[in-house]
Amino acid sequence: TPEQQRYVELFIVVDHGMFMKXXXXXXXXXXXIHQMVNIMKEAYRYLYIDILLTGVEIWSNKDLINVQPAAPQTLDSFGEWRXXXXXXXKSHDNAQLLTSTDFDGPTIGLAYVGSMCDPKRSTAVIQDHSEIDLLVAVTMDHELGHNLGIRHDTGSCSCGGYPCVMSPVISHDISKYFSDCSYIQCWDFIMKENPQCILNKR
């Protein structure tokens, strides 16, 4: 049944700029990440997906990839790094890079679509675009949604009168609900592609 629970083991990397922004305190950065992942759990409950934080790596000395304003290049480099280097890191299904770099144009996050469990492409890059953890967490929800095969909502999609997570435009109202379309697209992807890595929780 589609309702069979799925588990996304999430690995988060905090880049050097974001580490410095958080007053170079690793504890502060880690606490913020835990908060954001708890917010993500709420949204994903509706999709019958549990988000498990399996690791946080903080690039406290220097960035291990070239983090640049061109989001597609940064996403590509991060994917290469994950496939090559992070194998050493704990087993995980999906990795997100949080950066203080201001991406070109209105972009605040970028992810491959329908790439969950792919060694290189099960990744996303997220700009730490707000002082409000909640707003950044919604962007994390949104990009992970793309990895799970969810596209942007169109006019006919709804999530009960609230702003929806997969809306193409960022809303300053907090969107913590996935739309009916998102639900269908996510489970279409899971049933068709059957990404194996999200069946277990370790």
Curated annotation (Swiss-Prot):
Gene Ontology CC entries for this record: extracellular region; plasma membrane
Annotated positions binding Ca(2+): 9, 93, 197, 200
Cystine connections: 117-197, 157-181, 159-164
Keyword line: Disulfide bond, Fibrinogenolytic toxin, Hemostasis impairing toxin, Hydrolase, Metal-binding, Metalloprotease, Protease, Secreted, Toxin, Zinc
Stretches assigned to the Peptidase M12B domain: 6-200
InterPro entries in the record: MetalloPept_cat_dom_sf (IPR024079), Peptidase_M12B (IPR001590), Reprolysin_adamalysin (IPR034027)
Record: residues binding Zn(2+): 142, 146, 152
Enzyme class: hydrolase
Cellular compartments annotated: Secreted
Cofactor section: Zn(2+)
An annotated Gene Ontology molecular function: metal ion binding
The enzyme's E.C. designation: 3.4.24.-
Cofactor binding, per record: Binds 1 zinc ion per subunit.
Entry annotation: catalytic residues: 143
Tissue occurrence: Expressed by the venom gland.
Lineage: superkingdom: Eukaryota
Gene Ontology biological-process entries: proteolysis; venom-mediated fibrinogenolysis in another organism; venom-mediated fibrinolysis; venom-mediated suppression of platelet aggregation
Record text on subunit structure and interactions: Monomer.
Similarity comment text for this entry: Belongs to the venom metalloproteinase (M12B) family. P-I subfamily.
Purpose of the protein: Non-hemorrhagic metalloproteinase that hydrolyzes the alpha chains of fibrinogen and fibrin but has no activity on beta- and gamma-chains. Cleaves X-Leu bonds. Inhibits platelet aggregation induced by the von Willebrand factor (VWF) (IC(50) is 1.4 uM) and type I collagen (IC(50) is 3.2 uM). Acts by cleaving the vWF and its receptor GPIb, and by cleaving the collagen-binding Alpha-2A domain of the collagen receptor alpha-2/beta-1 integrin (ITGA2/ITGB1). Also degrades the extracellular matrix protein fibronectin (FN1), but has no effect on laminin and type I collagen.
Annotated protein name in UniProt: Zinc metalloproteinase barnettlysin-1
